[in-house]
Amino acid sequence: MRSLTPGDVVNLGVGMASGIPAVVQEQGLQGPFHFSTEHGGLGGMPAIGSPKKTGAFGAHYNADCILDSVEVFDFYHGGGLNVAGLGFAQVRGDGSVNVGEFQGNLRGPGGFVDISHLARKVLFCGELTAGKSETHVKPDTPAGLRIVRDGRHKKFLNRIDQVNFHGPSAIAKGQTVLYITERAVFRLTAAGLELIEIAPSVDIDAVKSAVEFEFTVSQRLCRMDEALFRDEPRQP
């Protein structure tokens, strides 16, 4: 939750980022944040589920207001978003992101371009690899992450199939961009991606082996909070 500030208007996309409200609710912090989906709901708690739980993407419990989708996108286009939490399919070394086409499947970007273009902070959330990866949380002391098997497909690539978010343009606009995965967190810089956090019990080689391009390592590289790897609510 360090990436969110009380009072933020936060858009949520599908995928891992859709779990943000559940974490906020677990910690009892939902009051200060205003969650938004492009379907029109603003405020309250989005009724977004997960692959194993029933959800209704676009619906909100106790919304402050419900707008037309056109009005929501006008708000986004005007720079009203503080934070956008989005998924990703492929990431290039300059921070550019593809969500529209991969492995021969053309999905299209949907509202992704509109949402990410002017959000002050963009959080791309997803796994480092795709295709039946297997990781286990180690809840004992010290807590951490055990990587059993990487997915068949790398997602951080030298070349991506489409550019739906342009990294260099984001830097020029002054956007803050983070790429948050299960084992590593990267920050976008003018020189490309910089590794700033790594999961406990994971070494840098386990990150480098899953990424095609070279990235820099922050001199202030730190471990992710061990509490994130325990099956218990994290105290705010």
Where are these regions (language model features)?
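Short alpha-helix boundary/capping motifs
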Residues: 28, 234-236
